[in-house]
């Protein structure tokens, strides 16, 4: 097939020909129950601040930051393989295996005491299980919605915001009372209950269609320029986004917040992120996902360079957590909708996973780079902030280029 013909086929999904049994319900009990189950599946939390202050206090923040960095890398790099398995076999076995691995990893973290043990449990095992839940959850929601797709995906993604809001508070409250081990076990049991709901409710509306195996299946998405530009945007934005998330707590302590209040910055960030995932999702269904993504990426860059960089106060740290949480939450929620817009439904798992694998390098290197920049600046955060701001700005530029390419340069168009 001619590459240009193939490109037009995948880049104009709004004009795809109807196929038998492929009408999108865009609502109803089954469709919204999938959203509820996917929401439960994305309920996760962040524990790095505790590692730095307690279990791994003898190690530098840069060294400890490899735990979330490797964790995100594993979740992203496995995307193409999990996505391909979803396209070929459906979500059922992936969700079951993911549940077992995710909970097992948290249980093993509860009895860990050495750095390598946290790497194995929290940076490899648990994220691998989480990936087997995350990609099928997003992909299944996509098969049930079209007109309300961005809203449905935003509600789904807000599950991680709620988890990120609640779990740090739970952890901070429980650790002094029952210790780190039982706190992690309590979180694992909580997630097990939620993941059972995910296993019972999340299903794809489209029957799996086994396709050819081999490296070509994973490289084909890169024959589309719109996919390449969108993936580059996600890569640079992710590089800029993960850094402030990783170092938000330590920065709060740096500007004078108490340990407990600095810990609540994560909850503030995630609560705001939840709003940023749902409200812009509703707007994106009206004006276009790419248009909303450009606006959100622009705001993120402004908040980074115009607020976090010049602000050196406790108030500015709190304000940044809230505002950046909102804008970055939009990115998290709308990214799957962007890929769905330029992809065939039957390949949504593979193409989504391939995009996230492209972002895995950013996930792996962003946090360690941030830690190294802090050390090179003598404990100051200004180099980290400038670097993150430049990455966010580059991501914004590539979102604009992707949008202009898709619309053939037309400015006032829903896309």
Curated annotation (Swiss-Prot):
InterPro entries: MFS, MFS_dom, MFS_trans_sf, Proton-linked_MCT. It holds the Pfam family MFS_1. MFS-type transporter; part of the Fusarium detoxification of benzoxazolinone cluster 2 (FDB2) involved in the degradation of benzoxazolinones produced by the host plant. Maize, wheat, and rye produce the 2 benzoxazinone phytoanticipins 2,4-dihy-droxy-7-methoxy-1,4-benzoxazin-3-one (DIMBOA) and 2,4-dihydroxy-1,4-benzoxazin-3-one (DIBOA) that, due to their inherent instability once released, spontaneously degrade to the more stable corresponding benzoxazolinones, 6-methoxy-2-benzoxazolinone (MBOA) and 2-benzoxazolinone (BOA), respectively. Its main location: membrane. This is MFS-type transporter FVEG_12626. Gene3D superfamilies: MFS general substrate transporter like domains. Residues 1-18 have a biased composition (Basic and acidic residues). One of its GO terms (cellular component) is membrane. Residues 1-22 are annotated as: Disordered. One of its GO terms (molecular function) is transmembrane transporter activity. Glycans are attached at residue 199. Belongs to the major facilitator superfamily. Monocarboxylate porter (TC 2.A.1.13) family. It is found in: Membrane. The chain crosses the membrane at residues 27-47, 63-83, 93-113, 118-138, 151-171, 178-198, 227-247, 264-284, 290-310, 318-338, 354-374, 386-406. Fusarium verticillioides possesses 2 unlinked loci, FDB1 and FDB2, necessary for detoxification of antimicrobial compounds produced by maize, including 2-benzoxazolinone (BOA). The FDB2 cluster arose as a duplication of the FDB1 cluster with rearrangement and expansion by incorporating additional genes. The keyword Transport applies. It comes from the Eukaryota. Keywords: Glycoprotein, Membrane, Transmembrane, Transmembrane helix, Transport. It is a multi-pass membrane protein.
